[in-house]
Every structure is written in structure tokens, then in C-alpha cells.
């Protein structure tokens, strides 16, 4: 976990994600042979935001700065939609065991897990 006096060191990771977003946008713009300043700015800002979120999540899991940098850069390059899909799968893997059918609840005869199981 990051210390209170070290938070500023983690600002570099959204910048790395922004570079990833710029590379991704540049690749697409070259393929389409068209460049838009607005799309470029939106891509850069969204990559920085996603990079910050990935950095905060990784710091909460005590990942090393090397892993944080790699994760932030890849998240910026892959884009927000990819990160949302991965995050959604992660959340589903944590929630699904609670929602899976279990033994019959004797109080109301409905299948499903209860908090008493």
C-alpha cells in the first residue's frame, strides 16, 4: 500500500497509461488516414483516468511499481472498454459464488444459498 508521503510517485503511472492511449489512437488514426484533435484529447484523458484507476487498484493489492507501470501502460493501450470487461469478469468471479444455487432453504423452500450455510 502506498504511504501518505509517497502518493505523488504514483502520478507517473497515469502518464504511462496516457502514452499507451496515444499509441493506440495513433495506430488507429494511421490506419484510417484521419486525425481528430478532439478524439486524440478524449483518448488521452480516458487513458489517464483508466491508468489512475488501475494504479490505485494495484496499489491497494500491494503490487510492485513495476507491475503497476505495466498494468497502467497496458490499460491505456488496450482502452477503457477492455479494462471494463476485465474488471467486470473479476467482479463476477467474486460475486458468482454467492448467487449460485445451493441447498434448499428450509424456511421458505426456495433453492439458493443463505447466509447461514
Swiss-Prot record:
Superkingdom per UniProt: Viruses
Keywords: Antimicrobial, Bacteriolytic enzyme, Cytolysis, Host cell inner membrane, Host cell lysis by virus, Host cell membrane, Host membrane, Membrane, Transmembrane, Transmembrane helix, Viral release from host cell
Gene Ontology terms describing biological process: defense response to bacterium; viral release from host cell by cytolysis
Membrane-spanning parts: 6-26, 40-60, 67-87
Membrane topology, as annotated: Multi-pass membrane protein
InterPro entries from the UniProt entry: LydA_holin
Biased composition regions of type Basic and acidic residues, renumbered to the chain: 107-117
Gene Ontology annotations for the cellular component aspect, listed alphabetically: host cell plasma membrane; membrane
Molecular-function annotations in GO: catalytic activity
Main subcellular location of this protein, as a coarse class: host cell
Region entry Disordered, spans: 97-117
Record's subcellular location: Host cell inner membrane
Self-association state and partner proteins as the record states: Homomultimer. Isoform Holin: Interacts with isoform Antiholin; this interaction blocks the holin homomultimerization and delays host cell lysis.
Protein name, per record: Holin
Organism the protein comes from: Enterobacteria phage PRD1 (Bacteriophage PRD1)
Amino acid at each position: 500500500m502506498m504511504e501518505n508521503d509517497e502518493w505523488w510517485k504514483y502520478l507517473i503511472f497515469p502518464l504511462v497509461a496516457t502514452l499507451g492511449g496515444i499509441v493506440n489512437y495513433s495506430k488507429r488514426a494511421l490506419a484510417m488516414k484521419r486525425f481528430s484533435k478532439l478524439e486524440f484529447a478524449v483518448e488521452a484523458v480516458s487513458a489517464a483516468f483508466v491508468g489512475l484507476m488501475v494504479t490505485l487498484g494495484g496499489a491497494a493489492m500491494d503490487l510492485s511499481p513495476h507491475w503497476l507501470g505495466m498494468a497502467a501502460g497496458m490499460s491505456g493501450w488496450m482502452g477503457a472498454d477492455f479494462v471494463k470487461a476485465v474488471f467486470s469478469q473479476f467482479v463476477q468471479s467474486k460475486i458468482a459464488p454467492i448467487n449460485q444455487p445451493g441447498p434448499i432453504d428450509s424456511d421458505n423452500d426456495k433453492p439458493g444459498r443463505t447466509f447461514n450455510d
